[in-house]
Amino acid sequence: MPKKIDTKKIEECIREIIVALGDDPNREGLLDTPKRVSKMYEEVFQGMTLSNREIAEAFGTTFENEDYDSETHNNMVVVKDIPIHSYCEHHLALMYNMKVTVVYIPKDKIIGLSKISRIADMVGRRLQLQERIGTDIAEIVSMVTKSSDVGVLITGEHGCMTSRGIKKPGTLTTTTTFTGKFQTNDLLRQEALLIMK
């Protein structure tokens, strides 16, 4: 059962943050800010209300993959450059300009291509690490397709690096997650990486 985001509590906390920053939450420009931020958080953190299993169930439409022998074939399905955004769990800073590429080797079931994009989007709607986004996407795609052979490549910019601290805009972070044959077969992993980039 999905968890519920406590929007009232978020409103109260945002109001307190405004006061702590030295501003007046009752002035015209800020009067509705706690409510607006609360609604925004409910939207951008929607993925926090669902477990990986619940996301798999929500976006798990598959098609039978008849007449396909996965033991003798390593044919890959690749969905490239899915745009997502997320928020860093360390600073609550935006992770943006993110592109997710997912590859898997079909077994008995094939997932609808749009569902892979929906899975990536929903996983991004959490307080996250980029590495965990890849791990969660791979786990969910594996749950849905029953394939243990999944790869995820993610690139993105992190607000905690581009707008604070070291302040290096344009710096990209790249992470990879590989499971099954992609993890154990170097040639297959290299082939997948060539296709994914």
Curated annotation (Swiss-Prot):
Ordered alphabetically, the record's keywords are: GTP-binding, Hydrolase, Metal-binding, Nucleotide-binding, One-carbon metabolism, Zinc
Alphabetically, the GO molecular function entries are: GTP binding; GTP cyclohydrolase I activity; zinc ion binding
One GO biological process from the UniProt record?
one-carbon metabolic process
Q: What is this protein called?
A: GTP cyclohydrolase 1
Q: Catalysed reaction(s)?
A: GTP + H2O = 7,8-dihydroneopterin 3'-triphosphate + formate + H(+)
From the UniProt record, report the name of the gene that encodes this protein. Answer: folE
Q: How does it assemble?
A: Homomer.
Q: What is its EC number?
A: 3.5.4.16
- Pathway participation: Cofactor biosynthesis; 7,8-dihydroneopterin triphosphate biosynthesis; 7,8-dihydroneopterin triphosphate from GTP: step 1/1
GO CC, alphabetical = cytoplasm
Give any Pfam family that matches: GTP_cyclohydroI
Name the species this protein comes from. Answer: Clostridium beijerinckii (strain ATCC 51743 / NCIMB 8052) (Clostridium acetobutylicum)
Where does the chain bind Zn(2+)? 88, 91, 160
Q: Which EC class is this protein assigned?
A: hydrolase
Q: Which PANTHER family match?
A: GTP CYCLOHYDROLASE 1 (PTHR11109:SF7), GTP CYCLOHYDROLASE I (PTHR11109)
**In which family does this protein belong, per the annotation?**
Belongs to the GTP cyclohydrolase I family.
- Lineage of the species this protein comes from: Bacteria, Bacillati, Bacillota, Clostridia, Eubacteriales
Q: Which InterPro entries match?
A: GTP-CH-I_C/QueF (IPR043133), GTP-CH-I_N (IPR043134), GTP_CycHdrlase_I (IPR001474), GTP_CycHdrlase_I_CS (IPR018234), GTP_CycHdrlase_I_dom (IPR020602)
